[in-house]
Amino acid sequence: MSSGANITYASRKRRKPVQKTVKPIPAEGIKSNPSKRHRDRLNTELDRLASLLPFPQDVINKLDKLSVLRLSVSYLRAKSFFDVALKSTPADRNGGQDQCRAQIRDWQNLQEGEFLLQALNGFVLVVTADALVFYASSTIQDYLGFQQSDVIHQSVYELIHTEDRAEFQRQLHWALNPSQCTDSAQGVDEAHGPPQAAVYYTPDQLPPENASFMERCFRCRLRCLLDNSSGFLAMNFQGRLKYLHGQNKKGKDGALLPPQLALFAIATPLQPPSILEIRTKNFIFRTKHKLDFTPIGCDAKGQLILGYTEVELCTRGSGYQFIHAADMLHCAESHIRMIKTGESGMTVFRLLAKHSRWRWVQSNARLIYRNGRPDYIIATQRPLTDEEGREHLQKRSMSLPFMFATGEAVLYEISSPFSPIMDPLPIRTKSNTSRKDWAPQSTPSKDSFHPSSLMSALIQQDESIYLCPPSSPAPLDSHFLMGSVSKCGSWQDSFAATGSEAALKHEQIGHAQDVNLALSGGPSELFPDNKNNDLYSIMRDLGIDFEDIRSMQNEEFFRTDSTAAAAGEVDFKDIDITDEILTYVQDSLNNSTLLNSACQQQPVTQHLSCMLQERLQLEQQQQLQQPPPQALEPQQQLCQMVCPQQDLGPKHTQINGTFASWNPTPPVSFNCPQQELKHYQIFSSLQGTAQEFPYKPEVDSVPYTQNFAPCNQPLLPEHSKSVQLDFPGRDFEPSLHPTTSNLDFVSCLQVPENQSHGINSQSAMVSPQAYYAGAMSMYQCQPGPQRTPVDQTQYGSEIPGSQAFLSKVQSRGVFNETYSSDLSSIGHAAQTTGHLHHLAEARPLPDITPGGFL
């Protein structure tokens, strides 16, 4: 076999001829060149002969003179074969068969053979004994990339791989032994295959045509322009050897040679195609480009698929104008790879067809060399469906930091892709050579960039090709959506102004009902002019239509309605982490403690009423004594400490009860306005007579407590020389002393643990978290039944005189009196333990000097 340097394969050898123009006949008397006249007549005859060939006009226009002659001879030989093969018998020449022949001619007009070729997974190939392609069907282009006119009457060895040429020659011989031929051995070593066989067989030397060993089935590799890996495609040949009639060949002596055997086979790809390849194999088209991808030619199928004529395709400039903006960089990467390696590989992108339609194609481009230099590009495209294109787009590996298709880089909504400093310099011409006229243009135009650049191709594209026509029956209007947004903004403004959550919910429900009523009118009333609306196009691309908007509005309405119905339930999103979680825990502890202390409230109440009656008698005896004149000062100081608590905001805890204002003889109620409990429902049960208090004190845990006795007298008894006092709830100035909670005056009466009367110990209300060493809770109040004025109690000091009291305070140092450290927290009464004694002489409150409150 010859070396690899002498091996050549089939390639496109055709070149586009110069367009022929009809020249006028010269006038008489003017001399003309006889050889030129001869060439002109020859060209005219060749053009007329080419027009008779059974090929499309675009193929005929690209044929050279030798190709026209070659195809003409091949056509005549094929016609001779069919004339002999289909020749009827002498019995058929009777007149009775003429009508059947006429019907056959009518059936032939249906082009049934073309449909059979399309349904066939392969192409038909007829090869003579001297290895010339006698016939190849037009479907060879779908598998090998060669057109029918490229291979007919050419050597078949130009298509076969060098390692498979010997096997193909063996299959052409009827006995599978081509070595019997004298000159066949040297033929395979030649560059273009073996020469014409020197031995011809007579029918007596050959077996019958229908013999079983005349069948052939073998495999070999054929040259393929569509393959992107090896350049060869493994094909399976299945057929038989048959006589090739009507060739009328003559031998060296001039004698007519008998018909010789030829291989009639069907070549199918060894790897079966997929369903999609079977469906789209007949739509493969090819385009020819310059090295900068400017199209310079397109075949008939490409014009049919894209809708352009060859003139329209070749006069637009850069081929990137026909590529989608999201695929330009991807195609440019394949273009650079093709320039470096000679082949681009399979590239999937979108091509712009006529009437602003995008077609997904799978393309493979190759460099074609001439004289050792790249000359042009041949690109083979196979149309894809939209589903296949989207699948390839998802699999595409994006090496760039952004992607055009997702909207991250807007190409058509900006005035300039560069900053003013980076504006490209204009091309200086004769008209702007002067300095005063020369200035950089800030606005990019088609002339601002290189004609073959990607940016120039993007600017030259029309923006309308990326706008999809509206097709949804329920369009959207921007005015409607903007109105919804404005109404949503008004909801937020009203909510910020009122601060009421219920008002917000009511407003949302009302608005949702109005929108649903508006939507019930139909799209024709809401969206009269919106077919060309950009917002509508965007919503249509997102798959949102009229029914989706209606369902979203209904969803919002039902969600708001259910929220309003469940307003009394606890919403964990509204819980304040710093304050209300502690309140929730405290409520849980209260509920567990109240169950244990409920059984003890009734005997305590009865015992307290007896003690209050005894205390009332003692206080009436003290009314006769003369009170000291400075008794009013501590009373006023105590009231000033209480009054600032009346100005607390609605966030703080309020007691669902009423206090008595202080009058001299009959106790007058302390009218505190009852406010709604917004967040805290801890003391909502303080309306009954048997009040439940949350905490039980620990015995012997308090170092010191004062003994006091409850009474049924007013809180501040009036003395003989004092005037009546009435303390309004909000007319006092704030005191400089630490403020206390209102709950200090609603503390329960404390009962000792071990008492001779047999009364069970009752827990007092626990105070909050801080202790103050300089103040004492002097009064405790218990709410009466059915919102009646509470009975007031008075502390009685066991040590006579204020100085003794102060000395005891200073000696002990620590009291169990507690006050709230934060106004936002809930105040409680002081926790005390000890024994109650019936005092013989109880000193009134004015004996306590103000020094105890410093």
From Swiss-Prot:
Q: Which GO terms describe its biological process?
A: cellular response to 2,3,7,8-tetrachlorodibenzodioxine; cellular response to 3-methylcholanthrene; circadian regulation of gene expression; negative regulation of DNA-templated transcription; negative regulation of T cell mediated immune response to tumor cell; positive regulation of DNA-templated transcription; positive regulation of transcription by RNA polymerase II; regulation of adaptive immune response
Task: Motif Nuclear export signal: list the residue ranges.
Answer: 63-71
Write out the GO cellular component annotations. cytoplasm; nuclear aryl hydrocarbon receptor complex; nucleus
Pfam families assigned to the protein according to its UniProt record, in alphabetical order: HLH, PAS, PAS_3
Q: Does the keyword Ribosomal protein apply?
A: no
GO MF entries = E-box binding; nuclear receptor activity; protein heterodimerization activity; protein homodimerization activity; sequence-specific double-stranded DNA binding
Q: Which domain of life is it from?
A: Eukaryota
Q: Which residues form the propeptide?
A: 1-9
User: Domain text from the record?
Assistant: The PAS 1 domain is essential for dimerization and also required for AHR:ARNT heterodimerization.
| Subunit architecture | Homodimer. Heterodimer; efficient DNA binding requires dimerization with another bHLH protein. Interacts with ARNT; the heterodimer ARNT:AHR binds to core DNA sequence 5'-TGCGTG-3' within the dioxin response element (DRE) of target gene promoters and activates their transcription. Binds MYBBP1A. Interacts with coactivators including SRC-1, RIP140 and NOCA7, and with the corepressor SMRT. Interacts with NEDD8 and IVNS1ABP. Interacts with BMAL1. Interacts with HSP90AB1. Interacts with TIPARP; leading to mono-ADP-ribosylation of AHR and subsequent inhibition of AHR.
Q: What is this protein called?
A: Aryl hydrocarbon receptor
Query: What is the species listed in this Swiss-Prot or TrEMBL entry?
Result: Mus spretus
